[in-house]
Amino acid sequence: RRGFAQRRKQLRKNLPDDVDWGKVCEKLKFSPTARAEELSLDDWVALTREVDPFFEKEEGQGDDEMLAVVDEDDKVVGSERRDIIHRDGLKHRAVHIFVLNQKGEIFLQKRSRLKDKCPGLWDSSAAGHVDAGEEYENCAARELLEELGLTNDDVREVGKLGAHANTGWEHVRLYATLAKGKIRVPCVEIEYGEWFTMPQIDDWVEAVPEDFAPGFLACWKVWKEANQGRFEDGE
């Protein structure tokens, strides 16, 4: 019933505030009072191309992307293509970011089923490989923008994880930040996302760990250790 009601609303009332509806209508030849139910499939594709900055966005790092190769101590020893690093199990770098809201909830993403690693599993708010020549913190800011549309520049390091099988042989830096602005996700990267309280996540991880990417589970353990007081207080 709610879905039917949304179809009857004027489209401009269902779009983000930053969309210039007048310009969109002028470019796509839409009526300013157009309703969702009045658009054809081609109209919807054209509208998505126009207002969604992530539409047809390619995955942030392809197989030919050059990543830093590191040793056991996380010292850079060279660079290599992403596909070769994964094929040969070379140690490399990655970041995970937990995005929190004012309520203290954490945004988790469900990885797209188009992803080559852990498709359809729940994961950190944002995560990604560190490019060759890139610093961890810069990578965290880039991933926030690419995966969530956030321009946060105040990420805080929470902890470090050494390279091992559970992290995919990645040296990981875990960051946290407070959400600033509305989260917008690219469907090629993320199937779905939702806010959860820390106890909700912890209970879920304990009950059904197979729902989560291994890298997230390793990061969650570090997060719990860094925020033990919150769990003990039942927050």
Give short role names for the model-derived ranges.
Residues 1-48:
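Class I S-adenosyl-L-methionine
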Residues 11, 40, 97, 175, ...:
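A residue-level signal for conserved active-site and pocket-lining positions in enzyme catalytic cores
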Residues 44, 94, 170-174:
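Short hydrophobic/aromatic beta-strand or adjacent loop that forms the aromatic wall/cage
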Residues 59-96, 102:
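Acidic, metal-coordinating catalytic segment for phosphate/diphosphate chemistry
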Residues 83, 157-162, 166-235:
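Nudix hydrolase/Nudix homology domain
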Residues 83-96, 101-142, 190:
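Conserved Nudix-box catalytic region and its N-terminal flanking loop in Nudix hydrolases
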Residues 131-165:
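Internal catalytic-core helix/loop-beta-alpha segment
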